[in-house]
């Protein structure tokens, strides 16, 4: 999904279908020069619309945390932003592999 303003790409979202019921909005990117146009909000809305049209029940809009070393801290403003779309917070384990 790409967002345009005056024929210029100003944002995009990448969705992956993860199973028959859900997909994940894996990346929701914007060009910060155009942040006042709220393309991130539009991209979430369009992703929700697309998921519903394709028979999916859930759209995972990703994690909402900051990392300070090994410490994980909730990113309150991002959580609030996502809750405006009706999102419900869930805790999920994150696995990492040290190479």
Q: Model-predicted segments: where are they?
A:
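A conserved beta-strand-loop-helix scaffold within acyl/acetyltransferase catalytic domains
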Residues: 1-35, 97
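Generic hydrophobic alpha-helical scaffold/packing signal
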Residues: 13-14, 48, 79
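Short amphipathic alpha-helical segments, especially helix-boundary/capping motifs
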Residues: 21-25, 42, 55-59
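Short, contiguous acidic/charged loop-to-helix segments that flank catalytic cores in large enzymes
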Residues: 30-38, 67-73
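Conserved acetyl-CoA-binding loop-helix of GNAT-fold acetyltransferases
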Residues: 35-51
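Active-site/acyl-donor-binding loops of N-acyltransferases
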Residues: 54-99
């Amino acid at each position: 999904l790409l967002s345009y303003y005056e024929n210029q790409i100003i944002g995009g979202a990448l969705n992956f279908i993860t199973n028959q019921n859900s997909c994940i909005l894996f990346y929701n990117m914007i060009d910060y020069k155009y942040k006042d146009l709220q393309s991130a909000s539009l991209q979430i809305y369009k992703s929700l619309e697309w998921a519903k049209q394709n028979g999916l029940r859930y759209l995972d809009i990703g994690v909402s945390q900051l990392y300070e070393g090994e410490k994980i801290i909730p990113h309150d403003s991002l959580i609030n932003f996502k809750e405006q779309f009706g999102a419900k917070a869930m805790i999920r384990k994150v696995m990492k592999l040290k190479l």
